[in-house]
């Protein structure tokens, strides 16, 4: 899983693990394009031959497995984890932590511990770290063995581990960040007192920790950067500096100090631009772009270049819209004298670095990129609630829900005639668009999740009554739609291969 910088209230978990409450509240095409997830529009992950997924009915877990549904939890679940191979289920129910081997049909749920407020697990679910109500932290295995590995943990969301579970990170009640080596009798290798506004970024194996500590000097905000590497053996401090983007997997970052922009990597810092304190950064690779009226400044680690861009206008305004995770594609809009267009700029090594116009930027709500660099955006007609979806300058869908789109292996999935604005057509029709050809799957769809091109889950006819919200669950498989269950509130799968695309203007506010 890709790491990213988080405020300490939202530290990253290391496997796909969602609150059932949160899943029920989200418009369910689950996760992505908010980068940093496990998924991509063309992942190498292969779905099991027999589709398997978890769904919830009023927070009670069920599993669909090749034509049959089975109740998995006896009671309401506050949080659950389906491992990436879809073979193990871990969940909390009324304070009890449970484990179940799904692959073993004869296996029953095993209670791991009581009075548990939160947990985290490694990718295959074989090692679990959990917090008790009194703040004690335990490490457990699926065979029932447990050991205490920490104490005085302050917040049930602030617990993370590496995949071997021999290092754990957490915050204490006095707001100290602790990184402990469980394999060495819980030896504390990082102990930093930080404020509530500080940030922590960590590599997946927890060998690199980057902390930005905020504080005040004479009522003025300030910050220092602490970098721990080599499992805490090396400590570097950059005083009076602010992180622009951290890349803990690479032990690197962009930061600003004394009004200039720097690149740091493995203990060494290089100034990349004078009199500059910000830039748009790629999520996975250390690429930074700064736009201006005459072009772009691009930094790739400590290497920089200027890219000229001229627009015949008395005044030019350039607005960054998206930079790809790998830093090779940059999307922007440029306007001058009343004209505005969407441009794509290829930043990859060896390209001619010439921006290419894609479309007029008129009534565009939001622009984003798919994993294979297609430019997706929506447009509205003035005074109309209907939205049309465009890809690389071509109209692919009219009257579509632009904040509920998925993309997988060249096909787009979206809901047409959302809210029934066109009274002559069926409402909320889930549609697949492949090479410009639309295929209607089913109407009255409220939520959906793409397992693969031949397997799509849908909740239809969603009802909202008092404390209940739910609908009928269907599976679209190999061209046929099959009813699975009723009164279903949410659906989940362990690995999402698709891009989640949100073009809703209001989601940006």
Outline where the language-model segments fall.
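N-terminal Lys/Arg-rich, disordered targeting/topogenic segments
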Residues: 1-11
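Sequence signature of WD/YWTD-type beta-propeller architectures
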Residues: 10-509
